[in-house]
Amino acid sequence: MAREAGLHSAQIKILRELLFMPTARFAELQKASGLESDHVKFHIKQLVKLGYVNKIGNAYQLSVTGKEYANKLDTDAGVIERQPKVAVLLVVEQHNPKTHMVEYLLQKRLKHPYFSFWGAPTGKVRWGETLLDTATRELKEETGLTGTFEYRGIYHERVRHQETGEIIEDKLFQLMFCDRFSGKLQVKFDGGHNAWRTLEDMMLEPKKYKGFETEIAACLNSIPLTERIYNYSDSEF
């Protein structure tokens, strides 16, 4: 867990105090922060300026933004909890009429981390966005295709640093399936390369995400929840 960048530890303590009170006076916030009066005044002013705290007469209270932010606090440790990334993972399927094979739209990643690794397209869920909207947007942005998606389950993957044992990634992928789409495939995009490949071909691919087969199978079989942990070395990540 780590404190969110930009907030002083004293400001975190003030937010924590306000989390459990409808309003609080200056003396109560000073006691919670453990700082001298002038320093507390500075930090309260900063929180007001950031929009986390409102001043009501001689008292202070959390704003709507402040309530949402403070709700992420680990109240025992007094820090903002680090949370998994939420993203969609797109499994886009087609039947090739020439080869009579089932193919999947896959990407070669040309940016860090996982440079040159092959896998299914993914994308972060934006604030306030539905999963279907995210899947549709990501497909259009990265491939030029327009598709219709259905939700298939959750794939929770943690990545552990092989040398240190530290968890370096924690991701909640919403599995989204599509076999109805239109448009012309955009082969190159900023940070990657698109291609239709079969699962048989991917079995021979030396550089693919370690969870590739698991996540594809989870989506195709509509498994509600799949959780895995994989080790990656410095050279792989």
List the predicted regions and their residue ranges.
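Nudix hydrolase/Nudix homology domain
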Residues: 5, 17-37, 187-237
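Conserved Nudix-box catalytic region and its N-terminal flanking loop in Nudix hydrolases
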Residues: 23, 35, 99-141, 145
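Short amphipathic alpha-helical interaction segments
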Residues: 33-49
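Acidic, metal-coordinating catalytic segment for phosphate/diphosphate chemistry
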Residues: 59-89, 166, 236
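Unchanged
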Residues: 125-149, 156-212
